A protein has these predicted regions:
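Non-heme di-metal
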Residues: 1-295
Length: 295
């Protein structure tokens, strides 16, 4: 069984793969920008967790990630703390493509799980520095959840959302089933897919019973789009790195250098991080430099 931080780094690398894969195929400009924006923040989190893992456990995160994801700084974690209303984006609507709806559902669920893990597990980590790093980044993950949930269609009914939720789960298990090479795990994906298809049928029945809508009014083409495939994201992420100096202002993105001194971003930063010298994400890198002479 992997220790918590090693398990976390494996999961963190996988989620960054998912985000990059979703962004690379997304056609909605607003959704694509949101994915790119949070992707660079998550890469910086991985960078800092990886240094903590090496410093405290003697494990190189690169060995856990299989070479698919490059461990490097992204948008500095300290600069990711934003005033709450700067994490809300313009939503999609019913006219969005099925692939866009799937992408929004997938990334919202992934970020929600990450936030829950950080918030629930941080208190049990073995060192004070690790607990503080979890706590700091949990705040950022909560912001990411707000961003991605705000992309959802606010006019969709609960049963329409239930149908899309079950459809999304079917799509993910189907994608895992197609890519899996381990027979035992492939059979598990197949079993879960069959279960979720049953849930999908039930959601369609509820939609028809209580809202008089056929599932095709929500999902016009019941066939899955191209399955989600995970692979190397190194070159793709390098192409996004040019936006590390961007932050959010209301529903839009802007360079930090273009913000006036009175901007909510700076007021919030001064409140949350009044002294950069005590910010956990900074302390991890400082400790790593002292121990190994490189970040």
């Amino acid at each position: 069984r992997l220790p918590p931080l090693r398990l976390h780094d494996c999961a963190a690398g996988s989620r960054r793969q998912v985000t990059a894969a979703l962004a690379s195929r997304e056609t909605d400009i607003g959704v694509k920008k949101a994915l790119h924006f949070a992707l660079l923040e998550d890469f910086d989190h991985l960078y800092r967790y990886s240094d903590l893992l090496d410093m405290e456990c003697g494990t190189k995160a690169e060995h856990l990630l299989g070479g698919y994801t490059e461990i490097m700084p992204g948008r500095p974690t300290i600069s990711e703390h934003r005033f709450p209303h700067d994490d809300i984006r313009y939503p999609i609507d019913a006219s969005a493509s099925l692939l866009t709806k799937l992408n929004v559902n997938i990334i919202t669920a992934a970020e929600q799980q990450t936030m829950n893990y950080y918030m629930n597990q941080q208190a049990f980590y073995k060192t004070a520095l690790g607990r503080k790093l979890y706590q700091e980044i949990a705040m950022i993950e909560e912001q990411h959840v707000s961003q991605y949930e705000s992309l959802q269609d606010p006019n969709a009914t609960w049963l329409e959302m239930l149908l899309l939720h079950e459809y999304t789960e079917c799509y993910l298990y189907y994608s895992c089933y197609l890519d899996e090479t381990d027979l035992a795990i492939r059979q598990m994906w197949e079993q879960f897919l069959m279960m979720e298809i049953g849930h999908l049928h039930k959601a369609a029945q509820l939609l028809e019973k209580y809202e008089n809508k056929h599932y095709s009014q929500v999902i016009p083409d019941a066939r899955f789009p191209e399955p989600l495939h995970l692979g190397s994201n190194i070159e793709y992420v390098r192409g996004v790195l040019g936006t590390v100096n961007v932050t959010a202002k209301h529903e839009h993105y802007t360079a930090v250098a273009d913000l006036p001194p009175s901007a909510d971003f700076f007021r919030y930063q001064n409140s949350v991080n009044p002294d950069a010298a005590i910010v956990p994400s900074h302390l991890v890198i400082e400790g790593y430099l002292k121990a190994f002479g490189e970040g």
